[in-house]
Amino acid sequence: MTKKVNKVVLAYSGGLDTSVILKWLQETYNCEVVTFTADIGQGEEVEPAREKALKLGIKPENIFIEDLKEEFVRDYVFPMFRANAIYEGEYLLGTSIARPLIAKRQIEIARQVGADAVAHGATGKGNDQVRFEIAYLSLNPDITVIAPWREWDLNSREKLLKFAEEHRIPIEKHGKKSPYSMDANLLHISYEGGILEDPWAEPEEDMWRWTNSIENAPNEPEYITIDFEKGDPVAINGEPLSPAKLLEALNEYGKKHGIGRIDIVENRFVGMKSRGCYETPGGTILLKAHRAMESITLDREEAHEKDKLMPKYAELIYNGFWFSPEREMMQAAIDKTQENVSGTVRLKLYKGNVFVVGRKSPNSLFAPEFSTFEEDEVYNQKDAQGFIKLNALRFIIEGHVRRKK
């Protein structure tokens, strides 16, 4: 039996799936629908979503379209990059990190308009359903969550198109449809489905939309500098930029030089493996630069302990636990390590590669002048003998014991 719902806030893109969901919610739940469309740098016009929502009977005051690019990069992407977060050694979490912001705004809008439910368009097989719904319930444990893909029988594109036709839902014709399922934001674009479902099949070159191929990248390297303040990038080549503008600029550098493509098989939280191809040009550059900045500003043990946190931190984001107390606890520890991570990194970009060729910081712990001091003033080489013997003590003891046997 369908639960009684008075008003629902739908995460709405204006595409086929969410437009069908909009009409389905109206029919199935007989409720008022509020649409929320977030601009997080997906590169598509978001205003058409307003026109389509109006055509589908949504009141103007129930249509929310917001530019969240700066908030997305400042409050989600940059904190994640302070951790150098990578899932399973390769994935820079571009899709994962966008979901908590969208969910947060849905809950805030629901509170604002007096809605008792939220809805999303994620399928019942993927990670996004988990990410959205854990975020919803973390922020409002009393909210009703509607996941149409787990309820309806419109389980094919043909059925969706038939429903759209029967309900006069406008469908744009864009010629040949891409065989891939794609998702984009300011950090990355992802590709799934089509021939990628065969892990042996190489994707066609024309699949990649954001970056040049290695073959078409410039034959000459390009040098850039990135300035950091307390772990976050603040300027490129000495020019201060807002978080979103800075990531946009790095994306352009990465696009030009063929940086940031990966083709991986990942372990989904729901239990199955999936293949995905990703382009994260700016993020790939930023990760390399940030690690270089840390290399001269973090104490050895501080850096090593921070590195131990990273796999779990990345897993929490991938699985949808951004608002969990454990992620917030880890974030506080990570942010503490960034207090001295300020300075400049110089990079060479060339045919898919990011080379660190220089780094400097007013807080640098790299002090070559110590090696030029007179003997015994800072470091007496004879002290190494005791240091080595103490660290070898357990091996010496073990060797004696084994020999007696």
Curated annotation (Swiss-Prot):
Keywords, sorted A to Z: Amino-acid biosynthesis, Arginine biosynthesis, ATP-binding, Cytoplasm, Ligase, Nucleotide-binding
Cellular component annotations (GO), alphabetically ordered: cytoplasm
InterPro entries (UniProt xref): Arginosuc_syn_C, Arginosuc_syn_N, Arginosuc_synth, Arginosuc_synth_CS, Arginosuc_synth_type_1_subfam, AS_cat/multimer_dom_body, Rossmann-like_a/b/a_fold
Subcellular localization, as worded in the UniProt entry: Cytoplasm
Transmembrane regions listed in the UniProt entry: none
Binding residue positions for ATP: A11, Y12, S13, G14, G15, L16, D17, T18, S19, A38, G121
Molecular function GO terms recorded: argininosuccinate synthase activity; ATP binding
Listed EC numbers: 6.3.4.5
GO biological process: argininosuccinate metabolic process; L-arginine biosynthetic process; urea cycle
Name assigned to this protein: Argininosuccinate synthase
